[in-house]
């Protein structure tokens, strides 16, 4: 159940990103594809891949948040 929720959340994250963050979006899509493969495998190696791809999501989201706050800071 939790794996399904994570997968739905990651797909939503990919589609809701602005177009201007193309490289970040492609990185998330690459990690999403590795996450889907690991769900199919569903082994301890797959669990490690899940953790790594979720760490990549969090890292990318933090980067996007930092960039947006930086732009906001310079626009004021």
From Swiss-Prot:
It comes from the Viruses. It holds the Pfam family DUF5488. This is Uncharacterized 8.6 kDa protein. It comes from Vaccinia virus (strain Copenhagen) (VACV). The lineage of its organism: Viruses, Varidnaviria, Bamfordvirae, Nucleocytoviricota, Pokkesviricetes.
């Amino acid at each position: 159940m939790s794996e399904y929720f994570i997968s739905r959340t990651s797909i939503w994250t990919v589609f809701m990103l602005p177009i201007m963050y193309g490289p970040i979006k492609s990185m998330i899509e690459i990690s999403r594809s590795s996450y889907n493969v690991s769900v199919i495998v569903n082994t301890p190696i797959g669990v490690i891949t899940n953790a790594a791809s979720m760490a990549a999501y969090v890292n990318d989201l933090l980067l996007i948040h930092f960039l947006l706050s930086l732009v906001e800071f310079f626009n004021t």
